[in-house]
Each structure stands twice: as structure tokens, then as C-alpha cells.
Amino acid sequence: MSETFKNQQQILAKLGITTLNPMQEQALLTIPAYPNTILLSPTGTGKTLAFLLPVLNELKIELQQVQLIILVPSRELAIQIEQVIRDMGTGFKANAVYGGRPISKDKIELSHTPAILIGTPGRVLDHLDRKSFNLE
């Protein structure tokens, strides 16, 4: 049986979260059944955590390949999501790629094959064209 990431309570405890807000609770129930869910909520209400928890359940820790690509509109959001994933202590390697920094730095990080790639659309497409990572 494939090892998957299932310990949401441990993540919440690590982040110091004792209760989820209503939007987060609804997202945890909705996203597994409807993966194209859109979360609308004010800034600072925990949308990043709300969409990451159910999505991480689908990833396989033992796979050494990009399993999830998160496209974001800005470098700031890419950096934020990468940091949240690291803070969660999931064991999944995540890398953010975005314009405004040397593409050579991205390529070095991508050579270590993250499970999760977060990036702006243009930079992700650039890396696809350069074959910096494999989508198989």
C-alpha cells in the first residue's frame, strides 16, 4: 500500500491551530469530492492551509517526482505557499519558481525533484520548455 500523507491533526498542532474556521472546515469536506473548488475569503483567513490539507492527502511520500503544480499570480504568493508547506513539516519537498530571480537558481533546486512546484505561470512554462522538471 502506498504511503500517503494523512496526519492533518499533527500538522494543525504543529502550527498551533486548535480549531478550524468555518471556511477551512468546509474546504476540508468539499475539496476531496470537488477538486476544482474555489475558496473565496478575506486575506488572512487560512485559505492556503484550507486547500493544502486535502490536496496533500493525494500525494505519495515515496514518489520522487513532481506530483503537484500550484500556479499563482505573484511571486509573493508563491513564496508564502512554499513557506506554509515547509512550516507544516509534511516531508514533501516544495520549490517556488517565479520571475525576478536567476533561472539558474531555479534549475539547481528543481534538479532535486520537488514533490510540489509552486510558481507563476510564465516561469513554470519557461521551465517546462527548458525541461527543468519531468511531468511523467
Question: Which role does the model predict for each range below?
Answer:
Residues 1-40:
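Conserved pre-motif I regulatory segment
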Residues 5, 10, 63-129:
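Conserved nucleic-acid-binding Ia/Ib motif block in the N-terminal RecA-like helicase ATPase lobe
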Residues 16, 129-131:
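Glycine-rich, flexible loop/turn motifs
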Residues 22, 50, 118:
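Short aromatic/basic micro-patch
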Residues 25-37, 48-63, 69, 79, ...:
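Walker A/P-loop NTP-binding motif
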Residues 41-45:
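The conserved Walker
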Residues 133-136:
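Post-DEXD/H (motif II) to motif III coupling segment of the RecA-like Helicase ATP-binding lobe
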